[in-house]
C-alpha cells in the first residue's frame, strides 16, 4: 500500500510538471510578440492640409514628416509589443491628428501612412515583406487612399494592357505584393462599380530587384505617390 501511495504521488507530481509546461507553452503561443525589442518603421504622410507631423509609438517620438507626401527612411526602434499606440501629432505639440493601436512584432518591418483630414484622418499600418523579387523583377503593392469621386468605390489596379495586378481594393486597404517587369511606368486604376471609367496614371520607372508601394491618393483628383521600400 505504501508503494502504491508513493507511486501515485510520483504520478501526481509528473502530471503537475506536465500541466505547468503546457501552460507556459500556451502563454508563449498566445503571445508571440515581445515588448521593447527592435523593429523598423517607415512613415508616410499623404494627408492633405495636415501640416507637418510628428510620429509617435507610445510616448516615444520616432520621426517627423512633412505634409507634402513625404516618406521617411526605415527607422529602427525598440517599440515592439501588443496594442502599441501609434500617433501622428501636429509637429512640436501634443495635439493628436490621428491615433490607432497595432500589434508590432519584433524584428519586423512596418509602413505607417497618415491620410484623411479632421474626423476622417486615419492611419494605415502594414507589415512589409522585404524578401527579394525574382532576378530582373520589381515587387510592388498598391494602396487605395483616394477619396476623389473618380475612385470612390473599390478599385482594380492593372497594367496599361489590361493585365490585372490587384483586384477589388477597398479604400484604406492595401494589396499584397506582386512581381512586375522592371521599367513599369504606367498603371490603370478602374473603379469596380464603373469599369468603363478607367484612370491612367504614371509613376517613376520601377527598377529591377527593388520593392515599392504605390499609393493612390487625392480628394479631388486621383494621383500617385511611389514609396521605395527597399
Indicate residue ranges for each PLM-predicted region:
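Sec-dependent bacterial lipoprotein signal peptides
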Residues: 1-26
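Intrinsically disordered, low-complexity polar regions and short flexible loop motifs
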Residues: 5-7, 24-230
Amino acid at each position: 500500500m505504501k508503494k502504491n501511495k508513493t507511486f501515485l504521488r510520483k504520478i501526481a507530481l509528473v502530471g503537475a510538471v506536465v500541466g505547468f509546461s503546457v501552460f507556459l507553452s500556451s502563454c508563449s503561443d498566445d503571445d508571440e510578440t515581445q515588448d521593447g525589442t527592435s523593429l523598423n518603421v517607415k512613415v508616410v504622410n499623404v494627408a492633405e492640409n495636415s501640416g507637418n507631423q510628428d510620429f509617435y509609438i507610445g510616448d516615444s517620438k520616432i520621426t517627423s514628416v512633412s505634409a507634402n507626401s513625404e516618406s521617411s527612411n526605415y527607422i529602427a526602434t525598440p517599440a515592439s509589443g501588443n496594442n502599441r499606440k501609434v500617433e501622428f501629432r501636429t509637429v512640436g505639440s501634443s495635439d493628436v491628428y490621428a491615433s490607432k493601436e497595432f500589434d508590432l512584432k519584433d524584428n519586423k518591418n512596418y509602413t505607417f501612412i497618415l491620410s484623411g483630414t479632421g474626423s476622417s484622418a486615419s492611419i494605415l499600418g502594414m507589415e512589409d515583406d522585404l524578401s527579394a523579387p525574382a532576378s530582373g523583377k520589381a515587387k510592388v503593392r498598391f494602396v487605395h487612399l483616394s477619396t476623389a469621386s473618380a475612385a470612390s468605390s473599390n478599385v482594380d489596379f492593372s497594367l496599361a494592357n489590361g493585365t490585372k495586378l490587384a483586384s477589388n481594393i477597398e479604400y484604406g486597404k492595401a494589396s499584397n505584393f506582386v512581381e512586375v517587369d522592371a521599367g513599369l511606368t504606367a498603371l490603370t486604376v478602374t473603379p469596380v462599380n464603373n469599369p468603363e471609367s478607367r484612370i491612367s496614371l504614371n509613376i517613376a520607372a520601377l527598377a529591377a530587384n527593388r520593392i515599392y508601394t504605390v499609393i493612390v491618393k487625392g480628394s479631388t483628383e486621383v494621383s500617385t505617390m511611389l514609396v521605395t521600400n527597399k
